[in-house]
Swiss-Prot record:
It comes from Arabidopsis thaliana (Mouse-ear cress). Residues 1-52 are annotated as: Disordered. Expressed in roots, hypocotyls, vasculature of cotyledons and leaves, hydathodes and guard cells. In reproductive organs, expressed in trichomes, veins of sepals, stamens and stigmata of pistils. The chain crosses the membrane at residues 99-119, 139-159, 173-193, 200-220, 234-254, 263-283, 304-324. Interacts (via N-terminus) with SCRM/ICE1. Belongs to the ADIPOR family. This is Heptahelical transmembrane protein 1. It holds the Pfam family HlyIII. The keyword Transmembrane helix applies. Residues 1-98, 160-172, 221-233, 284-303 are cytoplasmic. One of its GO terms (biological process) is response to sucrose.
Amino acid sequence: MDQNGHNDEAETVSCGNGNCKSKIVPGDDHGGDESSGTKRRKKRKTQQKTMKRRELMSYCELPEYMKDNEYILNYYRADWSIRDAFFSVFSFHNESLNVWTHLIGFIFFVALTVANIIHHDGFFPVDAKSPGNVTRWPFFVFLGGSMFCLLASSICHLFCCHSKELNVFLLRIDYAGITAMIITSFFPPIFYIFQCTPRWYFIYLAGITSMGIFTIITLFTPSLSAPKYRAFRALLFASMGLFGIVPAAHALVVNWGNPQRNVTLVYELLMAVFYLVGTGFYVGRVPERLKPGWFDRVGHSHQIFHVFVLLGALSHYAAALLFLDWRDHVGC
């Protein structure tokens, strides 16, 4: 109690270095009205807790479920409300570019899809074997898989800071999105190349779809979401991509005389290079491994991986357009 009869109390304040100090918090101005003073103190503490929840953290302050990359040292969000996580899309933290690279990619692919729907309305033409009447559904399956992957990735990176339960769930959806994108990428080339021999496109598409389902089931095992299985996850995705070597070799033999063969092959090789290089950054965690803390918000491996995934998808889109144009003019 001070000389004016006010009640002063000691309040414990947490310090960043783990030590705690006490400071004097003046009592109320109502002659010892404990109820009013207590309410103000509770309100102040609530506001402090709210602000603390929205503060960016360092790696060592994170809960265990969010510790994924020890070379990114700062600017983390953790245990944020859904509302705060949503509005963090407009702030600058270490997930900002992860969100925006694939969110912009999703919007771009939506625009491409709408443009193609407006330009071509023949999803299931009556005579798919006649030139100019080629079915479009395999092409739109690829676009749908790409959009799902990009959107799932953006949502995962935006809301994974909410809770452990949501984090695990969104990681699974993210893995499912990557798998879906790989599976659906096979649909346009395999379908249009082997359209005149349906048994082959059925065999190849059934094969990659089965591999994808197995991959999703495997990755839905909670323990495989841990950082130590990063290389294993990448290996699963790479094995799905390498499956394409078999139908690609078959396609080269079947369409050796196709004048668009070389251009299409270049686009597909570019896609493979983009995906492999991006995966290399993702697994190696370069460049942040070389300079921890330097690339926390801009330029770390996952952001680079996202850019290469988007470039690979666009390269494959260009190849798919060539396949469509070829079948539109050639037919069976």
